[in-house]
Amino acid sequence: MLSGLVTALRTLTLFPVPGKETDTFSRSLFWFPVVGLLLGSIQAALGYFTSLLGWNELSAAFVVLGGIALTRGMHADGLADLADGFWGGRTRESALRIMKDPNVGSFGAIALSGMMLLKWIAILKLVDIGAFACIAAGVLLARWVQVLLASALPYARREGGTAQSFVSGAGVVHIVVTSALTLLFLFPLLHADLYANLYAVVAMISAALAAALLTGLLSYRKIGGVTGDVLGAGSEVTELFVWIAAALSAALKA
């Protein structure tokens, strides 16, 4: 079972995990919330300790850039590829072809820049009020959404691809188990946060589901399923939606 954790860490992070390569791709999905909690905790800690410098704008920037660094920029790259393909390709085939191009086009650059700016704004609000647990929760929920997308939609590329091994083995059991794990981690995590009341928790979970629905429907309509880029983009969109929901909830509470 731990081989699934190894695969999840190798896939989702830059951490050098020792051991042999395994083919436990579908089993690794069960560990996505665990890895999300780990990454989120690191980003939250990064935000907290840099905020002690008294320069919250810089702290928020460290959280955004830290998230990109911890994932080797993989999810950010997926967002850029998705934007280029979905808005630059008129047909399913052209969209998939553009998404496979390693070069970033104008749509991708705009999407990536906009995402980083909006994340920075939302995180700055959370840092200002000390809601660091909400930062971790956003990363946790984003990895859960990746499992939802992989389990609910077929793989889009007929010729196969990197993420096919994850998507082809995903199913209802992955949704059930990861949903339980996500809730198990989420409520204790946010219980310690002064600003994360029940309404905020509901708002954050709803924001994550909205991100999953938006990404899933758009991807199914455009390319008939998901790819690795779609899963990465879904993670990015979820983080943004959850952090905005948390920031708005805190503002309304205040």
Swiss-Prot record:
It holds the Pfam family CobS. The keyword Membrane applies. It is a multi-pass membrane protein. It catalyses: alpha-ribazole + adenosylcob(III)inamide-GDP = adenosylcob(III)alamin + GMP + H(+); alpha-ribazole 5'-phosphate + adenosylcob(III)inamide-GDP = adenosylcob(III)alamin 5'-phosphate + GMP + H(+). GO terms for biological process: cobalamin biosynthetic process. Its cofactor is Mg(2+). Pathway: Cofactor biosynthesis; adenosylcobalamin biosynthesis; adenosylcobalamin from cob(II)yrinate a,c-diamide: step 7/7. Keywords: Cell inner membrane, Cell membrane, Cobalamin biosynthesis, Magnesium, Membrane, Transferase, Transmembrane, Transmembrane helix. Its main location: membrane. The chain crosses the membrane at residues 29-49, 50-70, 98-118, 121-141, 170-190, 198-218, 230-250. InterPro entries: CobS. One of its GO terms (molecular function) is cobalamin 5'-phosphate synthase activity. GO terms for cellular component: plasma membrane. Joins adenosylcobinamide-GDP and alpha-ribazole to generate adenosylcobalamin (Ado-cobalamin). Also synthesizes adenosylcobalamin 5'-phosphate from adenosylcobinamide-GDP and alpha-ribazole 5'-phosphate. Belongs to the CobS family. This is Adenosylcobinamide-GDP ribazoletransferase. It comes from Pelodictyon phaeoclathratiforme (strain DSM 5477 / BU-1).
